[in-house]
């Protein structure tokens, strides 16, 4: 039987980050949804809008505000994660 988690953080804890989809990892950064939309729903919409994580990487923050359920705090959290990834990629 396939295990279901109520939030991808539980899946990460149990199986490791490698086992999560891009949408699930992004949902962890988004943290919570809004009425009628889970963090995973919002994450999937973000990925559909920008095509991929790479497509998201250089978007102006204002573009993310077009997505219902993304607040300034959530967008800043995503931007910080991308900056950390850039710095790691540069060997920092």
Regions found by a protein language model. Name each.
Residues 74, 79-85:
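Structured, non-catalytic alpha/beta "coupling" segments that mediate domain-domain communication
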